[in-house]
Amino acid sequence: MGSTSSLYAAIDLGSNSFHMLVVREVAGSIQTLTRIKRKVRLAAGLNSENALSNEAMERGWQCLRLFAERLQDIPPSQIRVVATATLRLAVNAGDFIAKAQEILGCPVQVISGEEEARLIYQGVAHTTGGADQRLVVDIGGASTELVTGTGAQTTSLFSLSMGCVTWLERYFADRNLGQENFDAAEKAAREVLRPIADELRYHGWKVCVGASGTVQALQEIMMAQGMDERITLEKLQQLKQRAIHCGRLEELEIDGLTLERALVFPSGLAILIAIFTELNIQYMTLAGGALREGLVYGMLHLAVEQDIRSRTLRNIQRRFMIDIDQAQRVAKVAANFFDQVENEWHLEAISRDLLISACQLHEIGLSVDFKQAPQHAAYLVRNLDLPGFTPAQKKLLATLLLNQTNPVDLSSLHQQNAVPPRVAEQLCRLLRLAIIFASRRRDDLVPEMTLQANHELLTLTLPQGWLTQHPLGKEIIAQESQWQSYVHWPLEVH
């Protein structure tokens, strides 16, 4: 029993898909062991009287038989099963739930829309970095949740009766992706949103986060097409035109859109366009977690950390036995350099955060081997679960670590899409210099330096006589100047 007592499971009986998440608690964080998702499309089985068809119920039970096998090893007190919009609506939900409980061997709780919204917000708060004041949007199969909050506290909660399955059946039933179907779907969604828009705007938000399959699909499309990961209304309109151009649902082909997600993509897209338009959202990013993560963190009674990225970095430093003092030393030098050039280079605060994060992890590759340590570091960061960092930010961190020393691979810095290529180059230069000047691993041996930027030219001024007194340091800096010059990064050292 010992090895299973730290296991927790969360099951979400959604209107479109059933999901199961099994995690292990590790040092105040969660490690994902199993994720199973099955498209059950329960909402599609509701008739005009809101009765679930036998076929839809059977699809659901069949899926739960798969889940049940995995649950046998987990203490019942560490399992939570919740049902959402379709089972709130269905007049015969009791029949479905009775058999579901028999199959799973644990209670199934039908939660209210507000409770669902609260749990979604908790999942986002525990797993997603960025500004504290946020608007969270989750487009489900039969309901859409919108929540505002600050830190761990929600300020407004709404659950609306519209979702990608119900909108598919209502506005795209003929499988025609014409402008008129999109117009009707968007108009209806805006009418549902209008009564709550004022209250959401009143509470306000600094960042908007999407936590659903529709937003996940958009992220996958944008990554596949090499766009940056911010979802904007302009990009949504472009994708709508692409869908209209395809003509019919069965012919919908967009780079990066999986077959599994394609069916409910147009209806989800129409709802999202309505949300962007009605609430005047500038951009949206993808959440790190939602309902299932909210359930798991709720069972663990873990406090929401103010800075999720810091928690992630601390956990990884411990796990890979990174020298934390040295990581801090490099970060301090890099921050000092950044602060001296940020105005000339027009750098944003998020770039500083990402540079410091790269410093905190720059020696992770040594846990594999000194030889090829930068390549090992890049591989680890690309493949580790990093709550608080978006997929594009992970890719940038990996790319910076790959280029922390040795000749620069410029193309890799241009292939990430978290920041513009020029910014990635600038962060890389600062990281490399910080690593060099902190390499003696003692605070008192880091020289006082000034760094000036004039367009792309960096001028580094060292204390009088420093280069003469440090022949190895002088050689390393000369080599670095040469490597930077190969990629047209002029560096002068005095």
UniProtKB/Swiss-Prot annotation:
SUPFAM superfamilies referenced in this protein's UniProt entry, alphabetically: Actin-like ATPase domain, HD-domain/PDEase-like
Entry keywords, A to Z: Hydrolase
CDD domains, sorted: ASKHA_NBD_EcGppA-like
Record GO biological process: guanosine pentaphosphate catabolic process; guanosine tetraphosphate biosynthetic process; nucleobase-containing small molecule interconversion
Gene3D superfamilies on file: 3.30.420.40, Exopolyphosphatase. Domain 2, Hypothetical protein af1432
Catalysed transformations (reactions): guanosine 3'-diphosphate 5'-triphosphate + H2O = guanosine 3',5'-bis(diphosphate) + phosphate + H(+)
GO molecular function per UniProt: guanosine-5'-triphosphate,3'-diphosphate diphosphatase activity
Entry-linked InterPro entries: ATPase_NBD, GppA/Ppx_hydrolase, Guo-5TP_3DP_PyrP, Ppx_GppA_C, Ppx_GppA_N, PyroPPase_GppA_Ppx
Pathway(s) per entry: Purine metabolism; ppGpp biosynthesis; ppGpp from GTP: step 2/2
Recorded family membership: Belongs to the GppA/Ppx family. GppA subfamily.
Protein name: Guanosine-5'-triphosphate,3'-diphosphate pyrophosphatase
Organism: Shigella dysenteriae serotype 1 (strain Sd197)
Lineage: Bacteria, Pseudomonadati, Pseudomonadota, Gammaproteobacteria, Enterobacterales
Gene name per UniProt: gppA
